[in-house]
Amino acid sequence: MKAHDGMYIDGAWRPAASGETIDVVNPVDEQVIDRVPAGTAEDVDAAVRAARAALPGWAATPPAERAARLAALRDVLVARKVEIAETVTAELGSPLAFSQAVHAGVPIAVAGSYAQLAATHAFEEKVGNSTVYQEPIGVVG
């Protein structure tokens, strides 16, 4: 059994504020396959604060660099696709082929799509006598 004892918040791994964990059970054989932190509202608030603090830097990052970072994320997801699919299959009991196509494949496609969008989207557009700027507006959630 693996044990993941932290959540990645504000650039660091940290335990849940509660100090508690949740067993992850394989639905096929009902064996505990992992243990993860039991996140709390306090943990969510910390993550949202960290995301809000990161926004100015991300908003100031040139679109080409954002695209490169999103493409790098896509590449990591591609490299770990089998591992992700096997983990999801163990957690959910879904068929491996489905986990590869959907649970691992869709995030790869989304990250790639967003990378392409960041590289090609017109974030500044002339409309009549006006200029419309599109920029990150904030944390959702």
Which residues make up each language-model segment?
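Conserved small-residue-rich beta-alpha loop and adjacent elements
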Residues: 122-141
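N-terminal Rossmann-like NAD(P)+-binding subdomain of aldehyde/semialdehyde dehydrogenases
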Residues: 1-128
